[in-house]
Design a protein with these regions (language model features):
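Active-site-flanking beta-strand signature of metal-NTP-handling nucleotidyl enzymes
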Residues: 43-59
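Short N-terminal edge-element motif at the start of the domain
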Residues: 54-103
Length: 176
């Protein structure tokens, strides 16, 4: 665990790089990571942005709007995590790894104040002994973690994959 002064110093560093962050969000994020590290000393972390599609208004096709409210409900992020876990469990079953428990750690925040369009920032935590890389995320047809993440988001939104796969964005420094 971080001491209060260490958490304050971390917040200064984070805010210098990314902008303002809630001290409560930072504290919770550090706790999630610490708890995951206590279970798995070797951790693979993935940073990803999950976006909503934009649908033009019928009267003005050039004016973007957000996706229908029924999809923007809080359950969409829950469906995302459930779909990703389901895909991983199915893969583990196919590979005969059903006896070994699997844990997915995650941190998420919905950005809607500083952005024109609401979207999620997500960090996924994996036991590095099980999963240690995204794979080629430029290939939508690959059998890798990047594809599973994209499929999970499309399923959460109830949209077709790979048609909406680009709604998932992996920043250049996505893997840790």
């Amino acid at each position: 665990y971080l001491m209060p002064n260490e958490l304050k110093n971390l917040r200064v560093v984070v805010e210098a790089k990314y902008g303002e962050i809630s001290s409560e969000q930072l504290k919770t994020s550090v706790e999630v990571i610490t708890n995951f590290l206590n279970k798995h000393p070797r951790v693979f972390a993935v940073r990803v942005d999950l976006r909503f599609p934009h649908i033009p208004v019928m009267d003005d096709p050039d004016m973007p709007t957000s996706f229908p409210p029924e999809v923007e409900e809080e359950e969409v992020i829950t469906r995302f995590f459930a779909s990703l876990k389901s895909q991983i469990h199915a893969l583990r079953h196919r590979k005969g790894k059903t006896g070994k428990p699997f844990f997915l750690g995650y941190i998420w925040v919905k950005e809607q104040v500083t952005s024109q369009h609401p979207h999620y920032h997500v960090v996924l935590l994996f036991n590095r002994d099980d999963y240690g890389y995204l794979g080629d995320y430029s290939n939508f047809g690959a059998d890798n973690m990047a594809t599973r993440i994209r499929k999970a988001w499309c399923r959460a939104l109830r949209l077709a994959y790979p048609d909406y796969a680009s709604l998932v964005h992996f920043p250049p420094d996505a893997e840790y």
